[in-house]
Amino acid sequence: MESKFDLEGLKILVVDDSKTIRRTAETLLAKEGCEVFTAVDGFDALSKIADHRPDIIFVDIMMPRLDGYQTCSLIKNNQVFKTTPVIMLSSKDGLFDRARGRLVGSEQYLTKPFTKDELLDAIRSHSSKSDRTAGS
């Protein structure tokens, strides 16, 4: 099995106002050896990003205060974090939502509820992009 070899030690931030989604993702990813941080909304996420410098960020679209599109846009407009992969999470699966996610700079769009394999595949497909943090 290739399970842990490429995920061990990766820092992942999960931003979602749903405690269930945060806990589920945190549990699944921690079992794979990831260091997982969670945030309840975009504002919370911005401070956690600055503090922990995650390798990959999962962001829910529909959140209070600062939604996922706004959060992603702020991340991608920051010189330090613009290359950090952002994967949008949403219960909506419309073409408009996916396109809007791309416009603000997200690398991928996962529809909730997601499976363990979808979550891990998303991380694997973008973790090579975050190897830049290994040397910094």
What are these language model-derived features?
Residues 52-58:
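Active-site beta3 strand of CheY-like receiver
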Residues 114-123:
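C-terminal output helix
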Residues 33-40, 48:
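Short hydrophobic/Thr-rich beta-strand motif most characteristic of the beta2 strand and flanking loop
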Residues 63:
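Receiver (REC) domain active-site loop signature in two-component systems and cognate sites
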Residues 23-31:
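Charged docking surfaces used in two-component/phosphorelay signaling
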